[in-house]
Amino acid sequence: MAVLDATPLLRMYARWRLGRLARQDAVAEQQRQLLRLVGSAAVTRFGRDHGFAKVASVDDYQTAVPLRRFEDFWQAYWQPSFPRLHDVTWPGTIPYFALSSGTSSGVTKHIPVSQAMVKANERAAIDLLVHHVANRPRSRIFGGRNFMLGGSAALKPLAPGILAGDLSGLAAGRVPWWARPRFFPNGPLAELADWETKTRLLARQSLQEDIRSMSGTPSWMLLFFEELQRLAPADARPLGTWYPHLEMLVHGGVSFAPYRSRFAELLAGSHAEAREVYPASEGFVAIADRGPDEGLRLLADNGLFFEFVPTDELASARPTRHWLGTAEIDLDYAVVVTSCAGLWSYILGDTVRFIDLHPPRLFVTGRSSYGLSAFGEHLTGEQIDRAVAAAAEAIGGHVIDYTVGPVFQGRGHHLYLVEFQPSVSAQQLAAFCHTVDSRLAAANADYAEHRKGDFGMDPPRAKAVAPGSFAAWMKARGKLGAQNKVPRVVADGAAFKDLCGTLSVS
């Protein structure tokens, strides 16, 4: 079905929005956002408990409200009246709950999503398009379909008027009627929950569509592209062959470093650009407004207030709580969010590093719970991701997915379980381990000290798992689909041993 090209209207809006962003004082805007949120929630149970009526500054707020995690909110505020949260931490009744993938803990969480948050997410999606047309003056992004490779759009009723589902499903359900022809999939196909069936059907139908943009998690997009390769001619491997009018590939959710070389290969010869976003079930944080290595611009005016805690202080009783007015560049921070859905100084679980403050741009560096220190080596998620990406590039391979964990035999070592494309030889696998080892030693003094002379720990080892192994494992856990992510680190030795057994790794 032909789609009326609405890109000229988008371009007109983009000129206005970009002018506003150019004049924005992000620090002042963040303070305005906080005081607006506090004022809105003063009548709630949480607002009364924390004296919101007296909060007049960032300092007042940080004095009144401690840092909390999901479990703290769940036990003290949400669980007693779940699923009907009325004037609990946000005014009115919460109509939606986003089901978090529970990447770190493995436990599915119900994250409140208010009507205000739905609108904030819609504004963030429009900002993404604004930055695209700003970088592509000849864009015709709305001349075809925008492909959202997400979870099921079907929502589960929890109570009358209250629904739960994947964040992507909540977004798909809110697309207005006039915009639906510009999005793919929709209708029954969008509501399919079985990922394997959905992938096969989407691949076949998408080849008949004029796809202009595509969004999803990198690992699941690669699985989808494998399905396309089974349908398309053998030489039709680049994305530009499958989707000749593709302009933008939107990725987020995990570090792009291990996938960069494979996507560069897929995008070769096409007119498409890769654009990173930082969405979360708790709110949309940032969008790449420039090139791939120039950071993501923080959304300072979109219903969220951000705090930043130095990662090495997160476990302390009284950590330093920065905000945009006091944050510094080149330091690692854990992200803390206050939102228009009733989250207050909520520890998001991600870590970032600012590369600029005027305007604020950052890199997502990992998860605050995503690290490995089974032997005192204190590796961060970012260091592991970068080492794996460099090692894969060194052997000419592409990583589809991987996880790493400790093995407590002898001095102990790290074992990397990696799904490569194409398959690799024993010699390549040995070279992969050598590069991972040397990169980590260069990046982390504690790791280098433990590896010196093999005294503190043995060299890392790697096992190449069969194609589809991680997808099969996720399916067995009931977590197959674009909203879920393979955990990069399984730090618990017993849990990692069980995973190895499931993947038939000895």
Indicate where each model-derived feature is located.
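Active-site glycine/GP-rich loop and adjacent strand/helix microenvironment
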Residues: 1-53, 61-65, 76, 82-83, ...
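A broad detector of the eukaryotic-type serine/threonine protein kinase catalytic domain
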Residues: 105-106, 369
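Conserved helicase ATPase motor motifs in RecA-like P-loop NTPase domains
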Residues: 97-104
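Short acidic-hydrophobic sequence patches enriched in Asp/Glu that either
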Residues: 117-124, 298, 380
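Conserved AMP-binding loop of ANL adenylate-forming enzymes
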Residues: 131-179, 189
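Active-site diphosphate/adenylate-binding microenvironment
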Residues: 28, 32-97, 110, 120, ...
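Short "domain-exit" segments at the C-terminal end of structured domains
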Residues: 106-116
